[in-house]
């Protein structure tokens, strides 16, 4: 992808060492390294865009990491992040923010590319979602569009991270976001991709119903609670809006138990129901994908796209062969006769 708060993401655990090697030159002022090509890119929280026969991948990392591909089989990892210098407002809004940017999302709307990103510190909900834009992905410079939304400890019961843009059937822009606390939030946006006047966030999904008390303890944070849901992504298909979310815990390498669930609605702002008819605000969600324990221990933080006549699902997976490092997972989406998405296998 996500959000009016800060969140539950130890993005620093499995991918940081890799990305610090790639981007250390951007921090040190030394000459930039050359791009390199890989068929198995290490990513966290990947999102994708397509323009002029080129795929672009953006993911968590110092200043937002980026790579390109012509075929989605081999990827050129670019040595420079999107932002080598973070906007001043990010440090002012999020004390302790270290420029390790989480969970971007990107979309084209009204002739521009818009990229949202998360600024936070692990396990707390003092967070912010920033915005960049430019006319073309090939254009060299992203324009700083400021902050979309912030969350504050003690003020908000949601976390402003993991943004996801969705444009509805009436060409209206919306944004979802969220991680733990009171779950997945949503607001309507104006034409500048900021929160529309008078809009207030509404909860559209929780891991558990708010009335539930018998839920597993949170092993990663004493602040965020047990509502282990995050990383929303809404995908339009055949008159439905499909809300994908990630359940449980990321960012612990081979100890992660992340997995993906889905629900759907005829209306962009819900209610989203799972295949059994349970509202996702009450803990509903149909399991869509989890680790197969052969190739991946766990999978999550997904995105879905319709590109070149194909529906594509991407996420990161904690690779068993790579000792729990997170790598890119890509699969074609299939559809049941009654309109539910599925993947045949993960391998």
Segments from the language model and where they lie:
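Carbohydrate-active catalytic/glycan-binding domains of CAZyme proteins
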Residues: 27-347
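Enriched but not universal
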Residues: 9, 25-26
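Sec-dependent N-terminal signal peptides
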Residues: 12-23
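Detector for intrinsically disordered, low-structure N-terminal pre-sequences
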Residues: 5, 21-24, 36
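Bacterial N-terminal signal peptides that target proteins for export
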Residues: 2-14
């Amino acid at each position: 992808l996500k959000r009016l708060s800060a969140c539950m993401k130890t993005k620093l655990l499995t991918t940081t060492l890799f990305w610090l090697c790639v981007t250390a030159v951007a921090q040190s002022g030394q000459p930039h390294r050359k791009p390199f090509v890989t068929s198995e890119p290490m990513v966290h929280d990947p999102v994708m865009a397509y323009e002029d026969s080129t795929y672009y991948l953006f993911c968590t990392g110092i200043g937002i990491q980026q790579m390109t591909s012509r075929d989605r089989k081999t990827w050129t990892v670019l040595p420079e992040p999107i932002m080598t210098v973070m906007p001043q407002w990010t440090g002012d809004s999020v004390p302790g923010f270290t420029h390790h940017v989480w969970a971007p999302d990107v979309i084209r709307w009204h002739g521009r590319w818009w990229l949202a990103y998360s600024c936070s510190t692990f396990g707390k909900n003092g967070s912010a979602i920033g915005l960049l834009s430019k006319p073309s992905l090939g254009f060299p410079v992203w324009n700083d569009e400021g902050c979309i939304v912030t969350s504050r400890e003690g003020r908000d019961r949601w976390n402003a991270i993991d943004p996801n843009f969705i444009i509805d059937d009436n060409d209206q822009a919306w944004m979802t976001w969220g991680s733990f606390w009171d779950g997945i939030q949503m607001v309507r946006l104006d034409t500048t991709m900021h929160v529309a006047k008078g809009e207030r966030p509404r909860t559209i999904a929780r891991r558990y119903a708010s009335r539930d008390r018998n839920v597993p303890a949170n092993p990663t944070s004493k602040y965020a609670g047990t509502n282990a849901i995050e990383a929303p992504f809404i995908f339009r298909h055949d008159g439905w809006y499909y809300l994908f979310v990630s359940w449980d815990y990321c960012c612990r390498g081979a100890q992660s138990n992340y997995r993906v669930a889905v629900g759907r609605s005829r209306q962009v702002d819900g209610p989203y129901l799972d295949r059994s008819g349970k509202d996702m605000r009450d803990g509903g969600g149909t399991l869509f994908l989890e680790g197969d324990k052969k190739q991946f221990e766990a999978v999550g933080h997904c995105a879905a796209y319709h590109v070149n006549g194909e529906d594509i699902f991407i996420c990161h997976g904690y690779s068993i062969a790579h000792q729990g490092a997170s790598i890119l997972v890509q699969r074609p989406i299939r559809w049941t006769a009654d309109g539910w998405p599925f993947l045949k296998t993960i391998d």
